[in-house]
């Protein structure tokens, strides 16, 4: 336990602070000539309130040290947030000195390890700030107040309000593969600009692969900066004075709101400590310091950029990444020609096979020395520098392997389909790692005189030892067999007796986290729903029941009411795809059942039910949502839809956006449900496939006119939903008279007359922000334009509602609404009234089959940050 930290023990009913008396200097300014020594690890320069300290920390498990900034008041090993010498630990002879010239120098045995390069720049003093930023300060007369700061040279951590500009990047500690490291920085690709994560090869500074990107910020103006704000939201700010913001992650809980309320009541509450870390496994993860009431404290993860570890390039070195049984961790497999590394630290990683190329270049009889090994359903990440050739007119799969064998520099080749057209990539390196891909085949060049899988380190001595060991084991086969049989019987008995308790543990450890869907048996779901006795509702795809898992966790179980055309494997594949989508405004898919003909989905339970119960209630005000809540729901719903339209790995058209499919949690945070239940479409496809249903009143005109269905159909449905949120009523409501039964026509009239507040739910009695009402109505009418090209994307809708775009022009009246009005609302009303009386239950449109067929390809699995050279 380090003596840097403060401790707060308690005895009986008395609590007191017990501080270890160490020489932590809390001077506000550090003068020229001040020093810190690694041989005196209990000395450090500390911020005014003791939150952060800069000094030397031990580089475990060695006896060397790092110059570091860390959280000074937290128990346990120091949580380091900055270090300039991570790759060059120093001995106990090291010294940090603020020299008389104003230069901050780290030296070890008279050798300079690192310097701030601020000699003769007017530095007068230094200070460790409460924000975690170490500053070298001048005077107003010389070079200004701040001459150098640690925030301008970030390591692997971003602290609240620490700017990450276009010229800066976070860099991880070396990855476990030892071949590379990860970085977070602004990526300029062709005409796009985004915040991205890349894997970089150490020996080749130009070899890198981008495997994750944040929202596209190509169209923003002014300086662009990524920042973690005080509320725990990670965003990109831009424009003059950074007034615009695009969220990478928006924290649903505003800690400052609770903090301010406590302050107003005369209470004290420590601000929440957070850090955003680029870990050496390639994931960008947000942590919050959690002080438990029971006295235990720890860093708790709040958000991660990547949910599937196999989406991270280089996580398995040059091996192939598979998910383990928990679906949360990477399980690394080696290709033919390579073996698991023997040292324990790299037990999951594989040896290199680059020697094949060298041997090939020095061997005259090249083809006779090597052969091709085939690895099914496997693809590889690669960059432009990894590629020898891309062959698009390959005749068959086998030909792709033969092409690699005939090329001396080829290490492997990948065959797959791109928009149903075959391709073959000839690769000279596999540094970025592989992943499972059902649509691809990998061909690996291996030595002809060896069979695989095998251990290339085998020698005669090891073979003799293993042979002798096998002989000894065979002496007692009967005894071993009996012991195994008894053990198996005991395990089987224990499993049967303890099944229910095991289910509860699994649910608590896996289901609640919802990182990946959990497989249930049909009997499991019968038990947790009390034989499907508590009906929550019926939707376009099935019936939903309330259930309880592990005796305490509420879930919603949807039983699909139609037989799916595809088999169990395809169903599970789609379930895993949906389950991998994590967004605060999407309902999490936590589990599934695929047993015989049963197909069920298990979702997180939303205590406040669906949005329609809150905006279409009667004159009673019990369920009345105020305007602020409505507008926040509208914005958040748009963010959720924009996510699966534009940001997730598989582009999805929802096809049934309506209030019944917008669920509300206990904080009235909206979550879109039923996404992905219609067929998924590849990023290169523009038409949705068969088995799609929608609800009348929310369907875009192209459904009726048999035009291609794109994501803009969801935009239309969202526009109709947004109108209903504003008006607090159905767009088509036969309980109104002929003049008012059609809300869009009435609302458009109020918008153009400048009396938009009259279009707001009458129960609110005019209590609403008029500017937001006008904005919502304009966006809604742009969304429901008849011409698809005139509708904005959902990403643009979010910007319009959040106010990060320019002034919204008045949209033209949609043609269908105009024709309806010109036809005469009185006649239309009478006709619809007759239909309403005759067919009360006819509310859904049956299955619509588009003319486009769908066929899966490797391209359909592309992430938004895929390399232009990679089929992924």
UniProtKB/Swiss-Prot annotation:
One Pfam family linked to the record: B_lectin
From the UniProt annotation, give the residues forming the signal peptide: 1-25
Per the database record, which ranges form the Bulb-type lectin domain?
A: 30-149
Enzyme class, broadest EC rank: transferase
What GO MF terms are annotated?
A: ATP binding; calmodulin binding; carbohydrate binding; protein serine kinase activity; protein serine/threonine kinase activity; ubiquitin protein ligase binding
Catalytic-site annotation from UniProt: 656 (proton acceptor)
Residues on the Cytoplasmic side? 494-872
Q: Give the record's membrane topology.
A: Single-pass type I membrane protein
Q: What is its EC number?
A: 2.7.11.1
Q: Which residues carry this modification: Phosphotyrosine?
A: 603
Q: Topological domain, Extracellular: which ranges? A: 26-472
Q: Which reaction does it catalyse?
A: L-seryl-[protein] + ATP = O-phospho-L-seryl-[protein] + ADP + H(+); L-threonyl-[protein] + ATP = O-phospho-L-threonyl-[protein] + ADP + H(+)
Output one GO BP term. Answer: recognition of pollen
Q: Which residues are glycosylated?
A: 49, 117, 208, 219, 261, 294, 353, 367, 390, 449, 459
The protein's matches in PROSITE patterns, at most eight in alphabetical order, are given as: BULB_LECTIN, PROTEIN_KINASE_ATP, PROTEIN_KINASE_DOM, PROTEIN_KINASE_ST
Q: Where is the Protein kinase domain?
A: 530-810
Q: What is this protein called?
A: G-type lectin S-receptor-like serine/threonine-protein kinase At5g24080
Species of origin reads Arabidopsis thaliana
